[in-house]
Amino acid sequence: MGIEKFETFILISTISILLCICHGFTPVDNYLINCGSPTNGTLMGRIFLSDKLSSKLLTSSKEILASVGGNSGSDIYHTARVFTEVSSYKFSVTRGRHWVRLYFNPFDYQNFKMGSAKFAVSSQSHVLLSDFTVTSSKVVKEYSLNVTTNDLVLTFTPSSGSFAFVNAIEVISIPDTLITGSPRFVGNPAQFPDMSMQGLETIHRVNMGGPLVASNNDTLTRTWVPDSEFLLEKNLAKSMSKFSTVNFVPGYATEDSAPRTVYGSCTEMNSADNPNSIFNVTWEFDVDPGFQYYFRFHFCDIVSLSLNQLYFNLYVDSMVAATDIDLSTLVDNTLAGAYSMDFVTQTPKGSNKVRVSIGPSTVHTDYPNAIVNGLEIMKMNNSKGQLSTGTFVPGSSSSSKSNLGLIVGSAIGSLLAVVFLGSCFVLYKKRKRGQDGHSKTWMPFSINGTSMGSKYSNGTTLTSITTNANYRIPFAAVKDATNNFDESRNIGVGGFGKVYKGELNDGTKVAVKRGNPKSQQGLAEFRTEIEMLSQFRHRHLVSLIGYCDENNEMILIYEYMENGTVKSHLYGSGLPSLTWKQRLEICIGAARGLHYLHTGDSKPVIHRDVKSANILLDENFMAKVADFGLSKTGPELDQTHVSTAVKGSFGYLDPEYFRRQQLTDKSDVYSFGVVLFEVLCARPVIDPTLPREMVNLAEWAMKWQKKGQLDQIIDQSLRGNIRPDSLRKFAETGEKCLADYGVDRPSMGDVLWNLEYALQLQEAVIDGEPEDNSTNMIGELPPQINNFSQGDTSVNVPGTAGRFEESSIDDLSGVSMSKVFSQLVKSEGR
């Protein structure tokens, strides 16, 4: 390829990327290939590069370029590349989620009748198409794949006696946060499928109550079709739109989730003629039988005039998905806040239809109505990695000759690719010299009155930061530690930005949190984190190694925590269940860290965002409290509280703080109480997909605790492994933490004492009973856990000289425990 052609290739690629930047999200990888064409093509304003310019990506033994005349439709459909043997495209990509879109238009070219072609398409880990034949005029297949290597290979395999073809290909990065978490399984509420590695095929993407949304009006180049063709009994529904009222609340749905055009329109019940009528609005969609499907519902209450006015139910295939949905409450008491809900369902055997319905709440009937704004239905790969039924097996081919041709072609193609990519790299470095490290900008700020934009000495390295009082680290050293922010080292995404695993020059592992300019967290949180963590050192607080603000970056470097968050070990990640002893020790460690924050200085420090995701575990599962971006210095000695705007995480937020905007250390105690029940029950603290009485974990757990039947809702993996007196003490501690008023809650010191005691009760040998007697375990108890034996409940506490009566502990729980605490708990922990 000549230099002039290569420069044209770079220019066109840059223009395509800039078009996406203008829309919002910036894809790292952005391949748009006009297959079989000697010239570039366009689709909805986006430029698809000529197949000639991108031919180095292709490994194929034969070159057959097909074309057809005509001016109808986009020119990318007028050419195609034909494969008579196994052929593949190899794309160099960053790891993470990508769109893969394949365009097909079956025209006739010489002896090739595209409508009769039969073939398979596969990636390294998924079969995308099998025994595929294009029967309609134009077909677009869209997939969402999580690429875990540095290359994505798309292989086209003709069926025996046939051929394969493709008109155009897209491979585009999408935000890793777009498909995350563990959606609830409709019909099996205890099941939470892990979506992180799922391959998905888009089956339907619908704009409810609104017009067609073309790809050039979507930040992620998606197309949304109107819902009219899927709607049953159209007279029961009506459409409305109100685009200006849509609110994108930080922490919830964004314009990358769905465009404003989708959230600003909806289909609702047509109940104006009879407001007392109760019925459902239903849509029906075609699906392939035998697969599980991922449903993403988009909601925005643009119909209500006030908060808490709209309550409705959601159904998938006649099964209840969610009841009494109150959108304004789900989005931080915001009217018209954009919100999405995810579900998974299994289609019935032999059924190729799925129905979705909305209907009014049967509890809140003042304003009977129901709405939905958008819906995405995606097919999930089966256990074999297949997204298509058929006989194709990856790695097979029609003949040994095809295999030999593929091997030889791959070898030659790989050699040429190395030369090509080497040339690209040299020219790219020349063009970009002097611009390395540039990022989107923030306004600089200062700490202690001095600018954070000063120059760094050339000798400063990450390994010397422990002796550098100001904790600053040069950007070059951060890049070196993370291999230039290699996406393969990305270990998570939080409210502040991405987190990378790094390694210092001495081999010490670190976690590098790089701020995202689009994040709802910014300068204030960055500064608070530095100020707080540079003051404190405690074995149960995550240590700050340093920070970097060079080139207007906002980067925080912490000690690396090998086992991640407590939340990830409770639900949604598929990790092994924690034992009861491990959970107690984790809670004790976190309580020690919070107790130190509250008492370790002349003025307490209130964390303000205590939750399971902010408690990290090292290689020995020792807990450390993390994420101090929202922390606040507590009140002076002569004050009872700090008046401040409400911040925190929904589900963990102290209701008294929320009502009065008065922050105290007891707000942390409330949040920690929620964590205690989360650790015990192993479920999300807020789950809107559950029945209304179960949505809020704190309320649900307290209901069962007051009935004396908390053991009925604990994590199933704990049954038969908890002593009833240990559970009782743990539950009573959590109950006291969740008192309505802060004055009625214990201090963190008292919480810590009680948790230590719960651990001792679990480990102690009950007098007169062998230690391995299973009748002491919760799994053997009747429902009323408070009715266990009321005999001698005193225990010998290992490592102490005296005996402690359980009743005496109960009597002391509401008062200061400082004297007793000092005898049982060492300041450095265990």
Swiss-Prot record:
Q: Which GO terms describe its molecular function?
A: ATP binding; protein kinase activity; protein serine/threonine kinase activity; transmembrane receptor protein tyrosine kinase activity
Supply the gene name: HERK1
- Disruption effect? No visible phenotype; due to redundancy with THE1. Herk1 and the1 double mutants are stunted. In herk1-1, shorter hypocotyls without brassinolide (BL) treatment than with BL treatment.
Upper lineage: Eukaryota, Viridiplantae, Streptophyta, Embryophyta, Tracheophyta
What protein name is recorded for this chain? Receptor-like protein kinase HERK 1
Record's comment on post-translational modification: Autophosphorylated.
> What does this chain do?
Receptor-like protein kinase required for cell elongation during vegetative growth, mostly in a brassinosteroid-(BR-) independent manner.
Q: Which residues lie on this side of the membrane: Extracellular?
A: 25-405
Q: What is its EC number?
A: 2.7.11.-
